Design a protein with these regions (language model features):
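Juxtamembrane intracellular "pre-TM" segments in multi-pass secondary transporters
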Residues: 1-8, 192-225
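Residue-level signature of transmembrane alpha-helical entry/exit and packing/kink sites
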Residues: 6, 10, 44-48, 101, ...
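Substrate-agnostic recognition of the 12-TM MFS/MFS-like secondary transporter fold
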Residues: 8-25, 51-89, 104-163, 178, ...
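Extracellular/periplasmic helix-loop-helix junction of adjacent transmembrane segments
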Residues: 27-59
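Transmembrane alpha-helix termini and helix-breaking/packing motifs in multi-pass membrane transporters
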Residues: 27-39, 94-99, 151-175
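Cytosol/matrix-facing ends of alpha-helical transmembrane segments
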Residues: 115, 167-203
């Protein structure tokens, strides 16, 4: 199962995405925390808290719409589109890292969070279509392990990159390279047609309200633990 075309390209794609997000986020935080960026318009503590909030905010705003989008279109096609968006964002992020533009990096961090918010639902919605029922638990386990391992490696890599000479320039190249590899991997994900005829409507506020209503359901809330 692991090396099958049904699973492996998708697994590599999502791991590279998690790795890239965390390298970029931690490069930004480390550059600010250790004063590698001059003329920061706000205090370091405020900047770090703002960065954390801006990365998480899209998950509250867009998760409901992201889930509807994941249900309404071919999942492989959606992943490829999201990886192209990631490539565009990281190309801008590479410039921001190289020029040490803190505020631009902050804006791009929000965009990275938004891209991740849309990738999350399709990442899990694809598995039941791609895998056999008896493979689903194993597939979920691989995805969880790959995601958290990628997060850990991303956190460690950010510090190592900035510790070497010309680290910011190398970090700029790394985030672009990982985005490109992620897109190339996504091209090999087989078609996963939508099983729904409903079209997704962009209603972030009402979507958030509906999500909170579902969260109040005891059975749904219990699934979190």
């Amino acid at each position: 199962m692991f090396f099958s075309k049904r699973f492996f390209p998708y697994f590599v794609t999502q791991c590279l995405g998690a790795l890239n997000d965390n390298i970029y986020k931690n490069v930004l935080l480390l550059m600010v925390t250790y004063s590698q960026i001059d003329n920061l318009p706000i205090s370091v503590n405020l900047f770090v808290n703002l960065a954390a909030g801006l990365f998480i905010l899209p998950f509250f705003l867009f998760s409901a719409h992201a889930g509807a989008v994941a249900d309404s279109m071919d999942k492989a096609k959606l992943i490829r589109r999201l990886k192209l968006i990631e490539l565009a964002i990281m190309s801008c992020a590479a410039t921001a890292i190289a020029t040490q533009s803190a505020m631009l990096m902050l804006v791009l961090l929000f965009m990275t969070g938004t891209q991740s918010a849309y990738f999350g639902p399709v990442k899990y919605a694809l598995l039941p279509q791609a895998l056999k029922p008896n493979e689903l638990v194993k597939g979920n386990a691989w995805v969880e392990m790959g995601t958290f391992l990628s997060i850990l490696i991303g956190m460690l890599s950010a510090g190592l990159l900035l510790a070497i000479p010309n680290g910011t320039l190398i970090a700029s190249c790394v985030v672009i390279a990982l985005s490109l590899l992620g897109f190339m991997s996504s091209v090999n994900i087989p078609t996963m047609p939508s099983q729904s005829t409903d079209k997704a409507k962009f209603e972030p506020i009402s979507g958030l309200k509906n999500t909170l209503k579902v969260a109040k359901n005891r059975e749904a809330f219990g699934c979190l633990f």
